[in-house]
């Protein structure tokens, strides 16, 4: 049968995920089956636990070891250049930093403006940097949480896509608080990747607008025309 023109499905947007460690956010994203193709998982550490998960799930993995560039004239620049090459071989629409523990050069960040996101374990702009849970406990804050944001050249800064806040309990330890925040990270990051893949994020200065799904009106109108129990999602 001659294939009919015009019915090829659009290719899924491609995503590269950068990790340094256990990769629980990577796992949450993969298991959410987002409408994108995870083209590769790249780690700066050969022993990152998330690499085994990616490999077991048939995702290409690569290591760009930052220690290999320690003797370069500009170690940070040389590492970022190698990382950029490794990423760009996959021509991703989106770069996802999922526990990627490296400070990136401005040139690297600029190259991915509007198409690189990060998850940070605090309610930004509070507590950029490391040890966020410990610092929140030391300050006695009652609300703590996590943030998904577009990456800019200022550390843990950039237009915020989504945040979740959790209450801090009087007897919380760093471990109990980080576990509750991580649970929220695993809800937020897959959703943010899905929004991006669906083309629903618009950066407007410091703010991000999340556009409604294209069929939102149709679903609402269909719901108005009938009583359906239990309610349909779409
Ligand atoms: C997460 O808490 C993330 O917010 C932070 O690093 C941690 C990474 O955890 N940037 P995992 O590797 O995704 O399990």
Regions found by a protein language model. Give the residues of each.
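One-carbon transfer enzymes
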Residues: 1-234
């Amino acid at each position: 049968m001659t294939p009919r023109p015009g019915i090829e499905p659009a290719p899924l947007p491609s995503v590269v995920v950068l990790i340094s460690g256990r990769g629980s956010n990577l796992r949450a994203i993969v298991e959410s089956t987002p409408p994108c193709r995870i083209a590769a998982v790249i780690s700066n550490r050969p022993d990152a636990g998330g690499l085994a998960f990616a490999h077991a799930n048939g995702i290409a993995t690569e290591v760009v070891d930052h220690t290999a560039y320690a003797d370069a004239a500009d170690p940070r620049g040389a590492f970022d250049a190698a990382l950029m090459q490794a990423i760009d071989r996959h021509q991703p629409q989106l770069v996802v930093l999922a526990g990627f523990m490296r400070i990136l050069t401005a040139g690297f960040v600029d190259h991915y403006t509007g198409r690189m996101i990060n998850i940070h374990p605090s309610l930004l702009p509070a507590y950029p940097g490391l040890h966020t849970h410990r610092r929140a406990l030391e300050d006695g804050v009652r609300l703590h949480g996590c943030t998904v944001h577009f990456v800019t050249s200022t550390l843990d800064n950039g237009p915020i896509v989504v945040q979740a806040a959790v209450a801090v309990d009087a007897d919380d330890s760093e471990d109990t608080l980080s576990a509750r925040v991580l649970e929220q990270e695993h809800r937020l990051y897959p959703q943010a990747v899905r929004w991006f893949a669906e083309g629903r994020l618009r950066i407007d200065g410091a703010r991000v607008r999340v556009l409604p799904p294209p069929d939102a009106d149709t679903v609402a109108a269909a719901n108005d025309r009938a009583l359906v129990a239990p309610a349909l999602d779409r």
